[in-house]
Design a protein with these regions (language model features):
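Residues in the helix-turn-helix
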Residues: 20, 31, 45
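Helix-turn-helix/homeodomain-like alpha-helical modules used for DNA recognition
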Residues: 58-79
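DNA major-groove recognition helix of helix-turn-helix/homeodomain DNA-binding modules
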Residues: 26, 43-61
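DNA-binding alpha-helical recognition surfaces that contact promoter or target DNA
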Residues: 9, 23, 34, 51
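Short basic helix-loop element that most often maps to the first helix and adjoining turn
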Residues: 5-20
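Recognition helix of helix-turn-helix/homeodomain-like DNA-binding domains
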Residues: 26-41
Length: 79
């Protein structure tokens, strides 16, 4: 599940700002920013954002005790 906290953590792992995430996910950067500030996302938008993270080797972690992101593998630059 995508949460604002997990999204921020994943962006941090990748060194991405909201504009970079928006471009990678094919959504407006303002949508990314608004979500992190409490506005809900459509399911389809959340799926695009999660796919962009997965493409970079980042998995989101959300359970009862923790929220964040882990880097499962790193893509080589230019790959």
């Amino acid at each position: 599940m995508l949460t604002p906290e997990a999204q921020r953590a994943a962006r941090g792992l990748l060194g991405w700002g909201v504009r970079e995430l928006g471009a990678a996910a094919g959504v407006a950067w303002t949508t990314v920013s608004q979500f992190e500030n409490g506005r809900p996302l459509r399911q389809s938008t959340a799926a695009k954002i999660m796919a962009a993270f997965a493409d970079q080797g980042v998995e989101l972690v959300t359970d009862e005790d923790r929220t964040g992101a882990v880097l499962v593998y790193a893509r080589r630059k230019g790959a």
